[in-house]
C-alpha cells in the first residue's frame, strides 16, 4: 500500500492548530476543509492529462486537461463531511457517494447504517475522506463496499492516522493509496489516536 504522510509546512502548521484543546467548532471546521484541500492536491498529483485545443482570447490555444476516470468523493458519515468541501474545491464536478458508518464504543467495530453510491463506480476514482484513521475498521469496511460495487481505483484521505490503523488498512487493502497529514504515536485503550485531535465529528458539528 502506498502511504504518503504529507510534510508540507502548511499542512503541518494547520494540523498543529487543530490539536488545540479549546479550539472552536468554527475554526476546527475551517481547518478540516483546508487540510482536506491540501491532501487532495497531493492525492491527485498522478492524474494523467491530455492536450486539447480550445478557443482562447486570441485564437486557438493548446491546453492540458485531466483525462481518464472521473472522480467520486466518498465521505464517511458523519465526520467525513468536514473534509468534503476541501476536495470539491479542486474537483467541483465530482460525484458525491456517501457511506454511513459509526464505531461501536464498546467493541470499537464499525457499524454500517447508510449508503448512497454513484451508479457508475467501476468507471470512477474514489477519494474516501474521513478525518481519523484509528483502528481502521470504518475505512476498511467502506473500501470493502466500494470494491463490491466494482470500484478498483481508491485513495483514502485522512487528517490523522494511528500506526495500528495504517497497518490494518494495508493488510486488508494493499492495493489502495493512503494520504494523511500526520501519522501519530498510537491508540489509547479507548481506541482514540494519541496525540490525535479528539473526537473530530463532535468538533466539526458541535454536537456529541
Curated annotation (Swiss-Prot):
Keywords for this protein: Allosteric enzyme, Glycosyltransferase, GTP-binding, Magnesium, Nucleotide-binding, Transferase
Regulation of activity: Allosterically activated by GTP.
Catalytic activities: UMP + diphosphate = 5-phospho-alpha-D-ribose 1-diphosphate + uracil
GO function term, MF aspect, one: GTP binding
Pfam family of the protein (one): UPRTase
Pathway: Pyrimidine metabolism; UMP biosynthesis via salvage pathway; UMP from uracil: step 1/1
Cofactor: Mg(2+)
Gene3D superfamilies from the UniProt entry: 3.40.50.2020
Taxonomy, superkingdom: Bacteria
GO biological process: UMP salvage; uracil salvage
List of residues binding 5-phospho-alpha-D-ribose 1-diphosphate: 78, 103, 130-138, 199
InterPro entries in UniProt: PRibTrfase_dom, PRTase-like, Upp_B, UPRTase/APRTase, Ura_phspho_trans
Function per UniProt: Catalyzes the conversion of uracil and 5-phospho-alpha-D-ribose 1-diphosphate (PRPP) to UMP and diphosphate.
Classification via NCBIfam families: PRK00129.1, upp
Protein family according to the UniProt entry: Belongs to the UPRTase family.
Protein's name according to its UniProt entry: Uracil phosphoribosyltransferase
Provenance organism: Shewanella woodyi (strain ATCC 51908 / MS32)
Biological classification of the source: Bacteria, Pseudomonadati, Pseudomonadota, Gammaproteobacteria, Alteromonadales
Amino acid at each position: 500500500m502506498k502511504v504518503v504522510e504529507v510534510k508540507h509546512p502548511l499542512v503541518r502548521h494547520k494540523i498543529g492548530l487543530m490539536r488545540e484543546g479549546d479550539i472552536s467548532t468554527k475554526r476546527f471546521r475551517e481547518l478540516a476543509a483546508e487540510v482536506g484541500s491540501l491532501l487532495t492536491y497531493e492525492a491527485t498529483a498522478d492524474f494523467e492529462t491530455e492536450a486539447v485545443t480550445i478557443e482562447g482570447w486570441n485564437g486557438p490555444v493548446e491546453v492540458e486537461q485531466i483525462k481518464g476516470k472521473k472522480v467520486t468523493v466518498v465521505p464517511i458519515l458523519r465526520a467525513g463531511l468536514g473534509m468534503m468541501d476541501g476536495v470539491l474545491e479542486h474537483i467541483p464536478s465530482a460525484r458525491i457517494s456517501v457511506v454511513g458508518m459509526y464505531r461501536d464504543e464498546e467493541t470499537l467495530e464499525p457499524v454500517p447504517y447508510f449508503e448512497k453510491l454513484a451508479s457508475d463506480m467501476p468507471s470512477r476514482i474514489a477519494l474516501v475522506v474521513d478525518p481519523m484513521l484509528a483502528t481502521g475498521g470504518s475505512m476498511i469496511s467502506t473500501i470493502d463496499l466500494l470494491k463490491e460495487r466494482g470500484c478498483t481505483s481508491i485513495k483514502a484521505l485522512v487528517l490523522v492516522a494511528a500506526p495500528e490503523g495504517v497497518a490494518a488498512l494495508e493488510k486488508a487493502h494493499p492495493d489502495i493509496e493512503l494520504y494523511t497529514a500526520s501519522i501519530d504515536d498510537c491508540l489509547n485503550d479507548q481506541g482514540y489516536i494519541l496525540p490525535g485531535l479528539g473526537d473530530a465529528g463532535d468538533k466539526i458539528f458541535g454536537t456529541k
